[in-house]
Amino acid sequence: MKRICTLLSVFVVLCTHRSSAVEAKPNILFIAIDDLKPLLGCYGASWIKSPNIDRLAERGTVFTASYCQVPLCAPSRISMLSGLSPDANGVYFNPFKVKNVLRRHLPEVVTLPQHFKNNGYITRAMGKVFDGRTVDAGHDSVSWSRPFVNQHRFAPCGPGVRGYQNPETKDRLNEAAKESPAKPLAGPPAESCDVPDGAYLDGAMARTAVAEIKELAQQPQPFFLAVGFHKPHLPFIAPKKYWDLYDRAALPLAAFQAFPFGSPPEAQVVPNSGELRDYAGVIKSGSISEAQQRELINGYAACVSYIDAQVDLLVKALEESGIAENTIVCIWGDNGWHLGEHGHWGKSTDYEDGTRVPLIIRAPNVGKGVRSSSLTELLDVYPTLCDLAGLSKPAHLQGKSLAPIMRNPTTQIHEAAISQCSTVDSQMSPQLVGGQLDELATIHSQMGWTLRTPRYRYVEWREAKLTDKEHVFGTKVLGVELYDYQTDPLERENLAGKTEYATVLKEQKALFEKMLPHLPKRVE
């Protein structure tokens, strides 16, 4: 009898353990990488050294045709984390004067991390998850169950100036700041210093994230940890050992460094590499020299490899804590970046290099070793993580779950991926302050919406008037663009005026009206 009771006790314990294991919610490690284009080995860039992200990709799903909603930091992140498109959330620019624009525009919206918090998760963030200009001092305090970690403004081996560690650069910028605090001196666009990884912000933050993972692994609740790396955003600064991974003379330059033939003037307003040209030693107009192009590409690649090493620290922390098999890892870039393509060095374009982003999801028991060319958007991440974690999806979400694609990579969920990019007519809009917008005033702009189908890209430009409280789009079409990636993968020529593409153009316009029904009827 005693033996029977013992066996029954063991059986009950085993069943209880199995039940709790089945019911356990997966953790989420949410890794945002600022300005990362799909320049990774797992995306076919064989010359890039990204072994750790590539290894993670082999165990997860790589979405090779993923697109951001806006090719600009702040609006892209608000769109993804709110689950609402820019036309639904009203955020199109990096804000300048208006603070906490997320809750100003969307006071009641439940963000992605907030939804997980509301469902019993410990939610924590460090680094650049939201763009800091769009949220409160707590990085949207209601989204996190623990305070936002923002102590990495200065790296451990010294404060640096805006992240620089070169002593001469630091001294020069410090002196200039003393003389003219309101107008700080520009630093160089790139830096290679022989310092440890933790000397720069992202390396310091990664080490804090490792400690956070190990502490969270001991908690009874599941966690949602968001880590936002700042590189490869300008300036391209990384420890020298990552620069040395590359032979600068052998680095590939952009194959086509001009605007597409026949592209409308609206498409050529923003791409003047304005962000880059604000740095010291960069000419204010005209073509970037080949020598500087190679330095910049070397710097961008070094930053990618640097971040790759930091991602590895986080993944190893999951493994060492024994929670890797019950943790979903999501790696994404907020927008694309031109490394000389179309003669542009920066973001904020409706072209492929401006809108296409990396998206990799490794999840337990689904999507291992999957690659999919199905069209996806960053809007899809919110519902996807809900599905993978077994949570209900908020009714306001505009994206679609990618879980079906992870199970069957040929599954199609979108007819087209939608992105949009606005340009500002500086003559119509004098409310430009330091290259940024005074969004308290009316901004006269042009908005370009783009549809990316498996073969084509259609862009439609219209006049827009944007304020902090409303956005009005005109009916008049200012310009259209059409690109065929089967015959012209580099977007060399706008085909919208070609007779042989008249039928395709008509089909794309019809699809545009179908997918963007909130816009006023066009007048051509």
Which residues does each PLM region occupy?
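Bacterial Sec-dependent signal peptides at the C-terminal "C-region" and cleavage site
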Residues: 12-24
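Formylglycine-dependent sulfatase
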Residues: 2-4, 21-481, 489-510, 514-520, ...
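Sec-dependent N-terminal signal peptides
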Residues: 4-13
